[in-house]
């Protein structure tokens, strides 16, 4: 782990001491080298001797998420250049250093082997994200969005802290490996039911489950591009990763405690997909589609079958890349037209023809068309939920149809139609933007050739 952590930490002095004309170039190239080097940790075998120490370890569940975190840092830096062009150099350095600190916290969170360490790092990610949203957001509502983000996350995670301290006093350890090997089935009584809720609530808020999702559209809409990318691609995955880690020690009461949450997740997918059909704000639509896709991950994780865990892991990686790409595309429009309203950015196919091809590919990936990894994740989740209850096939089928409708609605509204008068004199697309889209799309397609790399612990 130190082979990735120490170079990432050294980004901080690099950003501080680089000459002002070299800050963007140095940070982009260096972070791209770190992300390339992190690919060596991808093919994790069950023998973790080389990777294991008392504090941090990577296995086949955490290594895909670690690499996703490393992969997105250079893309966030590249995507933020135009946004910060007119800022003073001190503000640019602060912004980049916040992204690096967030990256370090995420790498340590995904590789932590103690649950209390995971909790501390889970909360640590809140601080740089909140500063990025509240300081560099576009509208005055960013402070309101930051408050929503802060209070939802804190109120959801306080019961988790109490539950972890209780488990520590009962079992004497919060080490992930020891907890999975300790035969301690929870008895069916009301106190253990409350313990289950306390453990799961923080992760369900972070995912977010429908009903706890109100902070997400606000935070996404008001965040700058790097904030939206890291929120959609990685921070939501902290919730899914936490569920997959902690649900093993909550047996056997998960079997009936999870029922209402699985139903809420599948129903929430339909509701949030339907909300997408009524959105006029482009970033808000992409944010609600994230809630819909995360509903699939929640349902698959709580059903607790090997296929469910594999489907949830694949969906998390696929959604991270797809939603980040969609936010980058929305940002390219915003940089030129200074509006997120879809009616005002219509007809861009005539002005930016190559960018419209990226829009088409991102929309197809969002609705899970082959050859993207989204398809493999969605198929596994659909099979899992169908084996749990036949009725869920109707809900998931309806969700797939609505997802296809709003994806094409978004594509047609933004790219087709009559060009508005203020869109006639916009800047052409840049090589930087095409590189960002390529680096998002390549993993989505190439992972289909060898999906076992991201299918997690239960792949055999």
Swiss-Prot record:
The chain crosses the membrane at residues 22-42, 65-85, 96-116, 117-137, 147-167, 194-214, 230-250, 256-276, 284-303, 308-330, 350-370, 373-393, 394-414, 435-455. Keywords: Electron transport, Membrane, Mitochondrion, Mitochondrion inner membrane, NAD, Respiratory chain, Translocase, Transmembrane, Transmembrane helix, Transport, Ubiquinone. It is a multi-pass membrane protein. It comes from the Eukaryota. It is found in: Mitochondrion inner membrane. GO terms for biological process: aerobic respiration; electron transport coupled proton transport; mitochondrial electron transport, NADH to ubiquinone; mitochondrial respiratory chain complex I assembly. Its main location: mitochondrion. InterPro entries: NADH4_N (IPR000260), NADH_Q_OxRdtase_chainM/4 (IPR010227), NADH_UbQ_OxRdtase (IPR003918), ND/Mrp_TM (IPR001750). It catalyses: a ubiquinone + NADH + 5 H(+)(in) = a ubiquinol + NAD(+) + 4 H(+)(out). One of its GO terms (cellular component) is mitochondrial inner membrane. Its EC number is 7.1.1.2. One of its GO terms (molecular function) is ubiquinone binding. Core subunit of respiratory chain NADH dehydrogenase (Complex I) which is composed of 45 different subunits. Belongs to the complex I subunit 4 family. Core subunit of the mitochondrial membrane respiratory chain NADH dehydrogenase (Complex I) which catalyzes electron transfer from NADH through the respiratory chain, using ubiquinone as an electron acceptor. Essential for the catalytic activity and assembly of complex I. This is NADH-ubiquinone oxidoreductase chain 4. It comes from Ornithorhynchus anatinus (Duckbill platypus). The gene is MT-ND4.
């Amino acid at each position: 782990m130190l082979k990735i952590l120490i170079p990432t930490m050294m980004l901080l002095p690099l950003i501080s001491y680089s000459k002002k004309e070299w800050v963007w170039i140095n940070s982009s190239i260096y972070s791209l080298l770190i992300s390339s080097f992190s690919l060596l940790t991808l093919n994790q075998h069950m023998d973790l001797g080389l990777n294991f120490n008392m504090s941090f370890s990577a296995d086949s569940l955490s290594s895909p998420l670690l690499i996703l975190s490393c992969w997105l840092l250079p893309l966030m830096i590249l995507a933020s250049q135009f946004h910060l062009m007119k800022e003073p150099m001190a503000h640019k350095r602060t912004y980049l250093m916040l992204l690096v600190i967030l990256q370090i916290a995420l790498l340590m969170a995904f590789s932590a082997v103690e649950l209390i360490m995971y909790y501390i790092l889970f909360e640590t990610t809140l601080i740089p994200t909140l500063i990025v949203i509240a300081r560099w957001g576009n509208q005055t509502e960013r402070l309101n969005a930051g408050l929503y983000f802060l209070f939802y996350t804190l109120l959801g995670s306080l019961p988790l802290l109490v539950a972890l301290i209780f488990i520590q006093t009962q079992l004497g350890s919060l080490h992930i490996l020891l907890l999975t090997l300790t035969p301690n089935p929870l008895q069916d009584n009301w106190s253990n039911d409350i313990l289950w809720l306390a453990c799961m609530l923080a992760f369900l808020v972070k995912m977010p489950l429908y009903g706890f999702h109100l902070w997400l559209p606000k935070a996404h809409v008001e965040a700058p591009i790097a904030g939206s990318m890291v929120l959609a691609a990685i921070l939501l995955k902290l919730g899914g990763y936490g569920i997959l880690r902690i649900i093993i020690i909550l047996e056997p009461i998960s079997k009936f405690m999870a029922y209402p949450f699985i139903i809420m997740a599948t129903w929430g997918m339909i509701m949030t997909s339907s909300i997408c059909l009524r959105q006029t704000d482009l970033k808000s639509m992409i944010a609600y589609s994230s809630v819909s896709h995360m509903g699939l991950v929640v349902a698959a994780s709580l059903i607790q079958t090997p296929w469910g865990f594999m489907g949830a892991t694949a969906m998390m990686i696929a959604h991270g890349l797809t939603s980040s790409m969609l936010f980058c595309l929305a940002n390219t429009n915003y940089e030129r037209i200074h509006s997120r309203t879809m009616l005002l950015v219509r007809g861009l196919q005539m002005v930016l023809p190559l960018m419209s091809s990226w829009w088409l590919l991102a929309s197809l990936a969002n609705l899970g068309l082959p050859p993207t990894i989204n398809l493999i994740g969605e198929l596994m989740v659909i099979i899992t939920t169908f084996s749990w209850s036949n009725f869920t096939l109707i809900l998931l089928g309806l969700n797939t149809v609505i997802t296809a409708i709003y994806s094409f609605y978004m594509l047609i509204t933004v790219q087709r139609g009559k060009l508005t008068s203020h869109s006639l004199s916009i800047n052409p697309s840049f090589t930087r933007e095409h590189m960002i889209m390529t680096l998002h799309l390549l993993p989505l397609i190439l992972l289909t050739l060898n999906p076992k790399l991201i299918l997690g612990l239960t792949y055999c």
